């Protein structure tokens, strides 16, 4: 699963805006992200979240807090 897809899945499942650290924690715990497949998960997840905001898939609510668009 791609990092943006994992983040969107977590946000949809939780149904509320979440801080990126909570998104990362839940995605790792649920097995959506494999830390052995993606080195430096933090850096790549933050880049994926920024890309999601640019593409319109996510909305940045406040510093580090995201929700699904629409």
Q: Which residues does each PLM region occupy?
A:
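Charged low-complexity interaction tracts in eukaryotic proteins
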Residues: 1-6, 14, 18-21, 26-70
